[in-house]
Amino acid sequence: MRLSELSGKEIVDIKRAERLGVLGQTDLEINEQDGQITALLIPTVKWFGLRKQGHDIRVPWHHIQKIGSDMIILDVPEEMPPRQE
């Protein structure tokens, strides 16, 4: 699958039934050694779509359960803390 095919898909946490963002607004963490995607870095958002600075949710790639035609379903552990920048 190409990155362009992933772009625009909604990211949903299956445990919380919560929309986390859209892949176009998300950063990817890539292993420089082998070029594999290791994690999604999802920015936290305040009201009206304004981004809260410095806080991202880091979701390891292996937490992705399913990539569908219009969404990506994640199984995010409850204890996963936000990433500080």
Swiss-Prot record:
The keyword Cell membrane appears for this protein = no
For the keyword RNA-binding, the answer is: no
GO biological process assignments: sporulation resulting in formation of a cellular spore
Q: Which keywords describe this protein according to UniProt?
A: Sporulation
Q: Which Gene3D superfamilies match?
A: PRC-barrel domain
The lineage's top-level taxon is: Bacteria
Q: Which family does it belong to?
A: Belongs to the YlmC/YmxH family.
User: What is this protein's record name?
Assistant: Uncharacterized protein YmxH
Q: What is the lineage of its organism?
A: Bacteria, Bacillati, Bacillota, Bacilli, Bacillales
